[in-house]
Amino acid sequence: VLFRSKMAGGILLGFLAVAGIVTGSQGSVTVYAAEELQGSGTAEDPYVITGSEDLWKFAEIVKASSDRNECAKVADGVTEIDTTVRGEKKDLTWNPIGDSSGSYKGVFDGNGAEITIHADRSINNNAGLFGILGSGGEIRNVTTAGSSKGWDSVGGICGQACSDAKIVNCNNKADITAQGGQAGGLAGYASSAQIESDTSISNTGAVTGTANVGGLVGQASGGMKVIVHEG
């Protein structure tokens, strides 16, 4: 069993048949169709993520969904995804999947890939690859790298994990900064959630905050569990 840690002191738009631009008084927004991703987004037939573009599209699909329970899996053979690059665009700031308007309730399988993010929410909460994991939400088999910054509830995998959400076989290399509190390598805050691994759980990113700072979880409550299966 291995634990490693490095610490330092609206408008709802529906899906279109094809991608397009919707314009209005507030400007324009690109709308991506679910059909652009391989798979149907169910647990049995998850969306297939082949790179950064697909991951950005998946995030947009989830945000436009009323249920936010879409599932996705990184394709076999994909070992690294850098979300700071999307097509010709570079140095992008990642928008966490799932937030206070609706937590993520699907299953995301990183399939062993390392995903680099630059999540900078500054004065806002819930920064990470995912913002808030809710009931039924599960993130598995992924390592986060890069940086995650916010006010409260900041982690590499997610800002918050609540209501029986699960983080399975995940690790973090990203530097975590909470300008307020609740900073953790995997999750800033966890309540009634479960962190589980078949081998080890690790954080090698620097974790900083003014209060409630932890290598894996900044603040835990409600019977949070950490389970490591041996043998």
What would you call each of these model-derived segments?
Residues V1-L2:
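Short, small-residue-biased leader/transition segments that mark boundaries at the very start
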Residues K6-Q26:
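Sec-dependent N-terminal signal peptides of Gram-positive bacterial secreted proteins and lipoproteins
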Residues S28-G231:
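Surface-exposed repetitive/solenoidal architectures
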